[in-house]
């Protein structure tokens, strides 16, 4: 990323000193993203202990995930509109999210009853969901000429959190009770709150924005205009279909490795780690390529490739070499498509509605993907193979729709930040998926 430092000051009027550098902005926001993923993934690792402590059924465990998805999905749309309005206070928004995150874990850690855990879960989900909005908007704004790469790096922060969490949390669980560990974990975000505020207190400020205060009605009008943008709505649909496939993929892949291939817990973990590790390497590369050659040139072959690999998984997974090879190949695209889709959406919108656009993307992904694990589960009960055909089909349909969407020509990194494509002033800002709930969050 360092190669473009000389472009960056165009859009970083507000940042002071060390906090002005491209490396600092990307590094800081990416690290924060990793913290959110680390904790969310750690809680999933602790799920058997939580289940036993509260005597939960499968429905009770599902209720925790549903609460997380509901809270993060519902808050994303109003959160996006408010984030765009509060642009000068993005540092405050990020710091508040980090504090709320710690508070949510504290509630979960000291909770004597199940309903209180749901409250903590909702707090955590809202904090993680809203963090993505200013963070990705800022990255998209500061790195508008290499938006795909910047958003991909942010995504990698989450993936690193996902990869490390099970190992560290599993190790610590051997030494202490789950609720003690969560209470200790909760202290970290509370301390980090101050660091986040110091680092990003000037993030959304710039000379232009200082003079404009957008009224709520004007912001709503600008937001409503997004729903009249046909290309944006189609990209949102593609992102939703991709979300449907993704949220069904990882849990049922884990079940498949257990049920059909009889792998041990350690072996399952190792196989799923292959996916993530390959993703960490390939995601920034794919983001960079999408900046250089265009979003569709990377996304469409990638989605078709995932579909084909998913279909091949069923007949070839009995051979351990083939299984590892297919998982590694899946990892090349499985995580990298989301930040590129986000970048493609942000390429189409103007200054001032980036966080709202991100909110729309998250909200639609939430609406579409909410039922997907249930559909996948019903198919899994009929025939394990059908679940994978369903996932492959979703990727195929998404690729076909994407093929039909005319996207603007990507401006290469040599161009000035403020010359947008599609005639929109390419100074827009953006947000990650978030897969917050799925994590992809």
What function would you assign to each model-found segment?
Residues 7-20, 203-235:
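Juxtamembrane intracellular "pre-TM" segments in multi-pass secondary transporters
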